[in-house]
């Protein structure tokens, strides 16, 4: 019997608990860390790796991916979609700059209510979406990396240069958070021969990974991105390959990790994209249907900022 693919994740978390290198980190929380890990997930059977040993809010994950694809960098549009995962960084900046002891809810309400306030305090700098869709080179010219990937997949699918990334050295200092999942590379194969349907796979290099909170969220949205691009270029879904650089478990997540390790995975759900928009920019959250998702209860844990 084939071992459930979620055990790759659980085994990695167990390895971190047993042999992870204890170290202090940028956030001051401290971590157990391992370097250079890999997980592989097959999407060709229609499933999607939404982990089941705790509840993953897949719609929030996909909404963030759709936001990346718009090229936007302000949290205001995310908040209007009830997505609050980026608020911590601009909120911390606001509190430090003003000395105001404002609550997260009050801050978010002001961002949504006032375009002027959102413009001043809600922008994250040139983070993921800006680099994906409007990378600026030395002469000031903008490049749409996503459009280039899709065009190359259609015209030169065997190229070894089909990738995009977000590590723009010249703009790192202006980002609220440096890119964690930074490089996405694509590979086309013909498993049934050159006369058969092409299959699209994607490899993601994540230089830094919060394995408890971040990985389940990122892997879900990366699988959805692969499915979207495969649909846009008329290819079948292949494999998602995930590579972790500094793969870590925060010291204030250890009890939560042990609880999750006590649970057995359930079957992965199915992902259906209900229509094919004219371009990658045409997708909305209503286009995605996840069926047969059964999970254990959610496990809460604090975010390290």
Swiss-Prot record:
Q: What class of enzyme is it?
A: transferase
Any one GO CC term of this protein is: cytosol
Q: Where in the cell is it found?
A: Cytoplasm
Q: Where does dUMP bind?
A: 26, 160-161, 207-210, 218, 248-250
Residues the record marks as active site: 180
One GO biological process this protein is involved in is: dTMP biosynthetic process
Could you tell me what reaction this enzyme catalyses?
dUMP + (6R)-5,10-methylene-5,6,7,8-tetrahydrofolate = 7,8-dihydrofolate + dTMP
Keywords annotated in UniProt = Cytoplasm, Methyltransferase, Nucleotide biosynthesis, Transferase
Q: Does the keyword Cytoplasm apply?
A: yes
Instruction: Give the pathway.
Output: Pyrimidine metabolism; dTTP biosynthesis
| Residues noted as binding (6R)-5,10-methylene-5,6,7,8-tetrahydrofolate in the record, renumbered to the chain | 210, 304
Membrane as a keyword of this entry, yes or no, is: no
Predominant subcellular localization, coarse grouping: cytoplasm
For this chain, the family text in UniProt reads: Belongs to the thymidylate synthase family. Bacterial-type ThyA subfamily.
User: Briefly, what is this protein's role?
Assistant: Catalyzes the reductive methylation of 2'-deoxyuridine-5'-monophosphate (dUMP) to 2'-deoxythymidine-5'-monophosphate (dTMP) while utilizing 5,10-methylenetetrahydrofolate (mTHF) as the methyl donor and reductant in the reaction, yielding dihydrofolate (DHF) as a by-product. This enzymatic reaction provides an intracellular de novo source of dTMP, an essential precursor for DNA biosynthesis.
Q: How does it assemble?
A: Homodimer.
State the NCBIfam families in the record: thym_sym (TIGR03284)
**Name by which UniProt lists this protein:** Thymidylate synthase
